[in-house]
A protein has these predicted regions:
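Hydrophobic alpha-helical membrane-insertion signals
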Residues: 1-31
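Secretory-pathway/luminal and periplasmic proteins that interact with or process carbohydrate-rich
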Residues: 90-95
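Residue-level signal for pocket-adjacent positions within structured domains
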Residues: 10-11, 15, 19, 35, ...
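Anion-binding and metal-coordination hotspots
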Residues: 1-3, 7, 66, 73-86, ...
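Basic, short loop/linker segments at the boundary and entry of helix-turn-helix/winged-helix-like folds
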Residues: 24-67, 72
């Protein structure tokens, strides 16, 4: 008996109009995204209110298109445009319309307010469904590649060397021009073009050095409160007849480091360690605050290569929807400084905020011996003269501190893993700190909706 196969006929046209809803399962995430986006107030979208020009695509459709494509790993505007033709769920979402890549890109860069509103709306929806667990929040940062090559950068020292070389070359070209004019015969070089090229290059290098110098001053100003606090504490110890321990704190310097970098393609990005410090990439430091249910409750982007100054601004970025419920913030040793902890735990007037920081004061060994895994007694009481660092280390050794701090790695780090490995987001599509920040918000909204969809399905099945 001959093998039998299903007859495939790709040439016969459909005689009746097709219903796109029949092509997308009822439990598909695209339905959930459309329902969620419809709850965002329309006043947050940037649209042409005059009604002139061509008809606009509905802003809720455009936002749902971006979110669905980010959830499914398509971030470039051309890839998203292609999905409107090839992806059945996207065709359903767009009702068989096909926004071009220019419209998609323009909508993405013009709607920061809508992305911020979507972030709040999704958290409110999660709270309404009682899926958030906000009392304890973990804060961390991850490096996301910039849309720029590290080879398009120059260091502060190298820029100075190149400026000196350009000065010599300009002088040489001017001398050749004078000789050619005196001899009344043209030079072999196109001297005006060469002078213009070097003048433009000089201006770019001077701007690079000016930006690096401004960054150094800004960093020194940010480090000054921590330095002043350390100096005041050491002086208080001297006044009490005690010898301060440890080396003298180094005063913040406004002089740029010779290796400080400026990138010509994306000037606000920086060279940062990546891959567990194994290599360097042109990147941004994407920060997130994550609750115990693995929802991102606060997000921002930093241009700093490390997290030393990032705890206060990232804690301040926690959405007002959940901020009043936060009682504890967990961070690793990279975030710890006395000034950073004080900024989170105390208001400017000295009153307490009600938030307690649990921070490692040094890198912790994740391998535990059998003895360390067994229940441990409470640590002995601190000495009255204990430093802030000793107090924080003691806080983490208490039963409460241990129980809370072990949640850090299993909340915020898996979120970054899902964003990078499952969603595939490892590189920003936009350039400049402002645009990168709005794209990170869009990524976090997309992640939160994906997380909410998963938890909602699990709750339904239970």
């Amino acid at each position: 008996m001959a093998a039998r196969f299903v007859n495939l006929d790709r040439e016969t046209p459909m005689f009746l109009p097709y219903d796109l809803r029949e092509w997308v399962p009822a439990d598909h995430i695209v339905h959930f995204i459309l329902d969620a986006v419809e709850q965002i107030p329309t006043e947050h979208f940037s649209v042409n209110q005059r009604g002139t020009g061509s008809e606009q695509y509905p802003p809720t459709m455009m936002l749902a298109l971006l979110i669905y494509c980010y959830v499914t790993g398509r971030f470039g505007s051309r890839a998203i445009e292609a999905a409107t033709h090839s992806d059945v769920a996207v065709r359903y979402l767009c009702a068989n319309h096909h926004p071009d890549h220019a419209s998609i890109c323009a909508f993405r860069t013009a709607n920061k307010a809508a992305f911020d509103a979507a972030f709040v709306t999704v958290l409110q929806l999660a709270q309404h469904l009682k899926l958030t667990k906000v009392g304890t929040v973990s804060v961390d940062g991850t490096k996301i590649q910039a849309n720029a090559s590290k080879h398009a950068a120059v260091s502060y020292a190298r820029a100075g060397e190149m400026l000196a070389q350009l000065e010599l070359e300009v002088k040489e070209l001017m001398e050749r021009a004078q000789q050619a004019e005196a001899q009344e015969r043209p030079d072999a070089l196109d001297i005006p073009a060469e002078l213009t090229r070097r003048t433009d290059r000089k201006a770019a290098l001077q701007q690079a050095r000016a930006v690096i110098e401004a960054r150094a001053k800004e960093l020194a100003a940010a480090q000054q409160p921590d330095y002043a606090a350390k100096q005041a504490k050491r002086q208080a110890q001297r006044d009490a007849g005690q010898k301060p321990r440890g080396p003298e704190p180094k005063a913040p310097s406004e002089t740029p480091a010779p290796k400080a970098q400026y990138n010509f393609t994306d000037p606000t990005s920086g060279i940062m360690k990546a891959g567990s410090g194994q290599h360097f990439e042109q990147s941004y430091n994407a920060q997130a605050a994550v609750d115990a249910a693995m929802f991102i409750v606060g997000a921002r982007v930093s241009v700093a290569a490390n997290d030393k100054q990032e705890l206060p601004p990232t804690a301040a970025a926690i959405s007002p929807v959940v901020a009043p419920q936060v009682t504890a913030i967990l961070v690793d040793s990279g975030f710890y400084s006395e000034a950073a902890v004080q900024a989170v735990e105390q208001n400017p007037d000295g009153t307490v905020t009600g938030v307690t920081v649990f921070a490692a004061v040094e890198k912790m060994d994740h391998h535990k011996t059998v003895a360390e895994l067994l229940p441990q007694p409470e640590p002995p009481a601190l000495a009255p003269a204990a430093t802030a660092k000793e107090k924080m280390a003691h806080r983490l050794k208490t039963a409460v501190g241990k129980e809370l701090y072990k949640l850090r790695k299993q909340t915020v780090e898996p979120v970054f893993g899902i964003i990078k490995e499952v969603m595939g987001f490892r590189r920003f599509s936009l350039r400049g700190h402002a645009k990168v920040s709005l794209e990170w918000t869009l990524v976090c909204v997309s992640y939160n909706l994906k997380r909410l969809f998963s938890l909602k399905n699990l709750a339904t099945m239970a």
